[in-house]
C-alpha cells in the first residue's frame, strides 16, 4: 500500500470512529455480536505480578478497562490507553479521570506515543484490523514492549461476516461505483491465523524467544435489522462514508439483508482471532 493510501485509510477510520464514539458505549453494542466476544476476551486476560505497565492500543472509549475496572481499580499498575480518534479519547479520559492509575494519549499502532521497552503487557480489542500496515504496527508493538513482555490481541479474521457482507455489497452497488467499493473493502485488514504468524515472525523470534498462539473463534449471531444496525453503524460506517443518500442506502440494505434472513433472524457469521504472544521461559 502506498503512502497516500495509508494516509487516506488512517484518516477515514479515525474520523468516522471519532464521530461515532457515543455509539460504542451503547448497551446494545456491549452485549451483541462483537460486544459479547470482547467481554469474554477481556475477562480471560491474565495479569502477572511483573505487569506493572499495561497499554491498550486502539482503546476506543476505554471499553476494555470498563470491563476490568472492578478487578483492577485498586491495582498499583499503570494503565495506558492509546487511541487516534479524538471523540473516543475524550470519552475515555472523562470516564477514568478520577483514577490516577489510568491515562490516555492520542496515537496509532504505527506511532505509539510511548518509550522503547516501556510496556509489560499490550492488549487490544477490535482495532488492529483497521491499521493501514500490519508490518508497521507490529514493528511498533515490538519497540514499546519490554523483552519479557506479553501481547493479547483480539481482531477480526479474514472471513468475518463473509455471508453478512454479501447483501451489503449488493446494496452498495446501487450507490457506489466499483472503485469506491474496492476502496471501502480495503479499509480493513483481512488476515488468517497463518498471516498473523508470518507478520509477527518478522519482528519476534518465534523459534527461540517467543511463543505465539492464534485461535480462530467462530459463532453465528442472529438478530433483527435494527439490532444489527446498532453495532454495524458504530463499527462500520466508515465503509459507506462516500454514500451520498444514506437514508436510501439503509432502506436498500434492509431489503437486501432480507435475502439471508431465517426464522431465527438475520445471521452474522462472526470470525475472530485471539492472538497471544509470550516470552519463552
Task: State each model region's role.
Residues 110-121:
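A short acidic, Gly/Pro-enriched loop at the edge of an enzyme's catalytic core
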Residues 1-51, 63-71, 88-91, 95:
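Conserved class I S-adenosyl-L-methionine
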Residues 121-134, 157:
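A short SAM/SAH-binding and catalytic strip from SAM-dependent methyltransferases
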Residues 53-111:
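Class I SAM-dependent methyltransferase SAM/SAH-binding core
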Residues 53, 149-150:
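Short glycine-centered segments of the SAM/dcSAM-binding site in methyltransferase folds
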Residues 203-204, 271-281:
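Core SAM-dependent methyltransferase catalytic element
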Residues 135, 150-220, 239:
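Conserved catalytic/acceptor-binding region of the Class I
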Residues 13, 19-23, 210-264:
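C-terminal helical/coil "lid" or tail adjacent to the Rossmann-like core of SAM-dependent
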Amino acid at each position: 500500500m502506498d503512502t497516500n493510501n495509508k494516509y487516506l485509510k488512517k484518516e477515514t477510520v479515525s474520523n468516522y470512529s471519532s464521530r461515532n464514539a457515543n455509539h460504542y458505549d451503547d448497551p446494545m453494542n456491549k452485549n451483541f455480536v462483537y460486544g459479547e466476544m470482547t467481554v469474554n476476551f477481556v475477562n480471560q486476560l491474565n495479569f502477572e505480578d511483573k505487569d506493572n505497565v499495561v497499554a491498550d492500543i486502539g482503546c476506543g472509549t476505554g471499553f476494555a478497562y470498563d470491563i476490568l475496572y472492578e478487578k483492577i481499580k485498586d491495582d498499583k499498575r499503570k494503565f495506558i490507553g492509546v487511541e487516534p480518534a479524538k471523540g473516543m479519547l475524550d470519552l475515555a479520559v472523562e470516564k477514568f479521570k478520577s483514577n490516577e492509575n489510568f491515562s490516555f494519549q492520542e496515537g496509532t499502532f504505527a506511532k505509539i506515543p510511548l518509550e522503547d521497552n516501556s510496556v509489560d503487557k499490550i492488549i487490544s480489542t477490535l482495532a488492529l484490523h483497521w491499521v493501514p500496515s500490519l508490518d508497521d504496527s507490529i514493528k511498533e508493538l515490538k519497540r514499546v514492549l519490554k523483552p519479557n513482555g506479553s501481547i493479547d490481541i483480539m481482531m477480526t479474521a479474514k472471513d468475518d461476516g463473509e455471508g453478512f457482507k454479501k447483501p451489503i455489497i449488493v446494496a452498495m452497488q446501487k450507490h457506489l461505483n466499483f472503485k469506491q467499493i474496492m476502496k471501502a473493502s480495503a479499509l480493513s485488514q483481512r488476515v488468517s491465523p497463518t498471516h498473523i504468524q508470518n507478520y509477527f515472525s518478522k519482528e519476534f523470534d518465534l523459534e527461540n524467544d517467543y511463543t505465539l498462539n492464534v485461535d480462530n473463534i467462530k459463532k453465528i449471531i442472529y438478530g433483527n435489522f435494527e439490532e444489527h444496525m446498532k453495532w454495524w453503524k458504530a463499527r462500520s460506517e466508515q465503509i459507506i462514508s462516500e454514500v451520498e443518500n444514506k437514508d436510501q442506502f439503509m432502506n436498500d440494505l434492509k431489503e437486501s439483508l432480507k435475502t439471508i434472513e431465517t426464522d431465527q433472524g438475520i445471521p452474522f457469521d462472526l470470525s475472530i482471532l485471539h492472538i497471544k504472544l509470550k516470552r519463552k521461559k
